[in-house]
């Protein structure tokens, strides 16, 4: 009996290890899928907005004309407000999952509080945070100060791929705003405010009605 031992703990440990590996594998697959989706969007936008340097001048002109006819419009993923378009496209940054634009729409607000970039190879860059003026979603940042080797990024707007969606202007296959999202956030806020005011008025009227009914009931008993 002294020489006997149980294999159950070992089996349990092995099972836990297998479960842990399956969980890690699932998380890895999800992460790779998300990275692949972001990479695909970057490639799509880049291909729609810039020409390959190896193409002829005529081809580049034709592509530029086509892009001008059907440019991409970038939208906020939360409230679908237009943020900019591919006519101001400069470049894409796959390492940070961002697109660089020369200008943006009035729906993009800038937080004037400046901070240093924490991104790799961007030492010395001073940034200002960008956010959607409609829903306050963080969109990215704008480069305000850069070292000499990154001067080309200065005053460019860097929008995060995760915060931006796009559609092709003039495309009949895509709908800018669905019926469920017809009212923007400002309209919803105003409607909710009006409903709250109506509820308050009804509450006051109900209280007065009860008061009148109470007085009538007492008057009926005394008559």
Curated annotation (Swiss-Prot):
Keyword Zinc: yes
Any GO CC annotation of this UniProt entry: nucleus
Highest taxon in the source lineage: Eukaryota
Annotated keywords: Cell cycle, Cell division, Centromere, Chromosome, Isopeptide bond, Metal-binding, Mitosis, Nucleus, Phosphoprotein, Ubl conjugation, Zinc
Assembly notes: Homodimer, and heterodimer with OIP5/MIS18B. Identified in a complex containing MIS18A, OIP5/MIS18B, MIS18BP1, RBBP7 and RBBP4.
Residues recorded as bearing Phosphoserine in the entry: 33, 36-37, 223
Biased composition (Basic and acidic residues): 21-30
UniProt GO molecular function: identical protein binding; metal ion binding; protein-macromolecule adaptor activity
Similarity annotation: Belongs to the mis18 family.
InterPro entries: Mis18, Yippee/Mis18/Cereblon
Subcellular location per the Swiss-Prot or TrEMBL entry: Nucleus; Chromosome; Chromosome, Centromere
Residues annotated for Zn(2+) binding in this entry: 76, 79, 132, 135
Polar residues bias spans: 9-18
Region annotated Disordered, chain positions: 1-30
Function text: Required for recruitment of CENPA to centromeres and normal chromosome segregation during mitosis.
Cross-link Glycyl lysine isopeptide (Lys-Gly) (interchain with G-Cter in SUMO2): residue positions: 153
Mis18 domain residues: 71-169
Organism: Rattus norvegicus (Rat)
One Pfam family this sequence matches: Yippee-Mis18
GO biological process: cell division; CENP-A containing chromatin assembly; chromosome segregation; heterochromatin formation; pericentric heterochromatin organization; protein localization to chromosome, centromeric region
Name of protein: Protein Mis18-alpha
């Amino acid at each position: 009996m002294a020489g006997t031992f149980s294999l159950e703990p070992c089996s349990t440990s092995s099972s836990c290890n297998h479960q842990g590996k399956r969980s890690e594998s699932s998380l890895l697959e999800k992460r790779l899928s998300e990275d692949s989706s972001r990479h695909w969007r970057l490639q799509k936008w880049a291909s729609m907005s810039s020409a390959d340097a190896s193409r002829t001048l005529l081809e580049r002109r034709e592509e530029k004309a086509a892009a001008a006819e059907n440019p991409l419009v970038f939208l906020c993923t939360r409230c679908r407000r237009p943020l900019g378009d591919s006519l101001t496209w400069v470049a894409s940054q796959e390492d940070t999952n961002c697109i660089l634009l020369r200008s943006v729409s009035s729906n993009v607000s800038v937080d004037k509080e400046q901070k240093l970039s924490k991104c790799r190879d961007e030492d010395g860059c001073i940034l200002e945070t960008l956010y959607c003026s409609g829903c306050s979603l963080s969109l990215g940042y704008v480069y305000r100060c850069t070292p000499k080797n990154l001067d080309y990024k200065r005053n460019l707007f860097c929008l995060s791929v995760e915060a931006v969606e796009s559609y092709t202007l003039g495309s009949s296959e895509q709908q800018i705003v669905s019926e469920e999202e017809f009212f923007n956030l400002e309209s919803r806020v105003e409607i909710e405010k009006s409903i709250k005011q109506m509820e308050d008025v009804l509450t006051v009227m109900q209280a007065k009605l009860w008061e009148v009914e109470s007085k009538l009931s007492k008057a009926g008993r005394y008559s």
